[in-house]
A protein has these predicted regions:
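Ser/Thr-glycine-rich phosphate-binding loops at phosphate-binding pockets of nucleotides
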Residues: 109, 113-114
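Cys-dependent protein tyrosine phosphatase-like superfamily
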Residues: 1-104, 116-186
């Protein structure tokens, strides 16, 4: 990693919070949560409501068009990047403008949508592609190769993740704010 060390507690990825008990939801609320981004589709949220829906730090930001409009391949999230630029830009805006504290990102399973957005965030923080792929592979049912292929696509097609995000409409000031939020610089 060249961007410094990731700030402990700056970013948490998880699966759906709909199964949290009331006590567990209160335990989450007692933490310094700045933003919870729920990346699920509206129909997923309707079927399994978030216990944080009414909290001021909660944002419902579906990361994918519904329907997606493409068949997702198993070995890359490249189509997710190519077909959801506006949604990805909105997620980055919500993170960049969040108050100080922890950002929690989740979808239904905490793998695909959450993993892809987390990878983009870590790339902005200048974490190496190998480290991002290894971090992604810690989630059961994921492949480091899929994330490696996704990051390679961002580099080949857009000239890197920062250029991809600029293409999406994310302002350079937002990228700098996210980098600052996520890292401890030496």
């Amino acid at each position: 990693m060249t961007g410094g060390q990731i700030r402990p507690g700056a970013l948490i990825r998880s699966d759906s919070h709909s199964r949290l008990t009331p006590a567990a939801a209160e335990a989450v609320r007692s933490q310094p949560i700045a933003r919870i981004l729920d990346l699920r589709w509206s129909r997923e949220l309707a079927a399994d409501p978030s216990p944080f829906f009414a909290d001021p730090f909660y944002r419902h930001v579906p990361l994918l068009n519904d329907p997606m409009g493409y068949d997702p391949p198993l070995d890359t999230y490249a189509p997710m990047l190519d077909h959801n630029t506006t949604r990805i830009a909105r997620a980055f805006h919500e993170i960049a403008t969040a108050p100080p504290g922890t950002v929690v990102i989740h979808c239904r399973g905490g793998r695909d949508r959450t993993g892809a957005l987390t990878a983009l965030l870590l790339a902005v923080a200048e974490v190496s592609p190998a480290e991002i792929a290894a971090d992604f592979a810690r989630t059961p049912g994921t492949s480091p190769e899929a994330m490696h292929n996704t990051l390679t696509h961002a580099t080949t097609r857009y000239g890197g993740v920062p250029n991809y995000l600029t293409h999406c409409g994310v302002a350079p000031t937002a990228l700098a704010a996210i980098r600052h939020r996520l890292t401890i610089t030496a």
